[in-house]
């Protein structure tokens, strides 16, 4: 019994030292996958293939079009960059598409005030069939990424067994930390185990990973957004408590600026991902994105809410028969983010409510700012009736903050 206790304590101490101190707020940036997938035909489609040129052009846009200054600093490579391994077993990029190498791209990103993320897979192959990181290559690959001055690693889980994942993800976390370079760690481990306990140990994940994918890949459609949202809401009692500074649930990329969402739905995804304290990884063509979609993604108040220092993940607190849902995220300085979300598909809906219905204090007077319109609603008390008009598959989002406390008469 004593030996068992000592072993458990030793394992616990080993896990705790993997904490790397990174990503105290949800990471923000750009990720190639959803928009550009595994397009490797640079002869047919040179502007959109997975290549050095694509990432340099996206880096330029991040730096020059205001994204970096708002916090979108990660430039993340996904699958299909690998050319193979050299004679020493080190990973090398595809030399035609990445002629100057990954270290060159990292230096380029850093010169613009950005960070570079890279992708690998714990298994024999990546999801698209490129060389993966087997257990015997974990330490070697971590060292390679550090030598390239990479700032984030996304480690996928295709072609691996549950046993390999249970060994490999903690091993990679330790290997990254051992390099001495601060490399944020994005894990896909829980997504391959069904996303829920008992197969997923979220306490362990929070110690070894900075963010993790729990559910299916998002696709460029409203149906896919709702599928992800529904899974997160259904399991919010499990997922919400484990998220926080340095360890985030990741519902996957933002689709805004692509082809599958209406304007209202784009606003809705941005608001809902923000209230979930989600990483904000765009995956769109920043060279051609519309001004309307830029406005959604570059909304300063939205970003302030997403980056709130408390790092509390929000929850759905009401589901009405009218197909209106209300989400709440507690923020610093006793503020809150509230999202009124319509699943209706017919016409704008007049939703009537009060702060009392949302369990706000009766001793405080609040003010709300509409996150998208900027309108201010003053003098809100718990019993103040209000109406918000929500478009089909759209949202109204409030940033609610106290302006004064009321004197409550002594009984």
From Swiss-Prot:
Binding site for substrate: 78-79, 154, 188, 213, 217
EC number of this enzyme: 3.2.1.49
Compartments it resides in: Lysosome
Top EC class, one word: hydrolase
Keyword Lipid metabolism applies: yes
Disulfide bond positions: 38-80, 42-49, 127-158, 187-209
Record GO biological process: carbohydrate catabolic process; glycolipid catabolic process; glycoside catabolic process; oligosaccharide metabolic process
Any single Gene Ontology cellular-component annotation: lysosome
GO molecular function, one term: alpha-galactosidase activity
Phosphoserine PTM positions: 322
Carbohydrate attachment residues: 124, 177, 201, 359, 385
Alphabetically ordered keywords of this record: Disulfide bond, Glycoprotein, Glycosidase, Hydrolase, Lipid metabolism, Lysosome, Phosphoprotein, Signal
Reaction catalysis annotation: Cleavage of non-reducing alpha-(1->3)-N-acetylgalactosamine residues from human blood group A and AB mucin glycoproteins, Forssman hapten and blood group A lacto series glycolipids; a neolactoside IV(3)-alpha-GalNAc,IV(2)-alpha-Fuc-nLc4Cer(d18:1(4E)) + H2O = a neolactoside IV(2)-alpha-Fuc-nLc4Cer(d18:1(4E)) + N-acetyl-alpha-D-galactosamine; a neolactoside IV(3)-alpha-GalNAc,IV(2)-alpha-Fuc-nLc4Cer(d18:0) + H2O = a neolactoside IV(2)-alpha-Fuc-nLc4Cer(d18:0) + N-acetyl-alpha-D-galactosamine; a globoside IV3GalNAc-Gb4Cer + H2O = N-acetyl-alpha-D-galactosamine + a globoside Gb4Cer
Function per UniProt: Removes terminal alpha-N-acetylgalactosamine residues from glycolipids and glycopeptides. Required for the breakdown of glycolipids.
Subunit details: Homodimer.
Family: Belongs to the glycosyl hydrolase 27 family.
Name used for this protein in its record: Alpha-N-acetylgalactosaminidase
Protein source organism: Bos taurus
Gene: NAGA
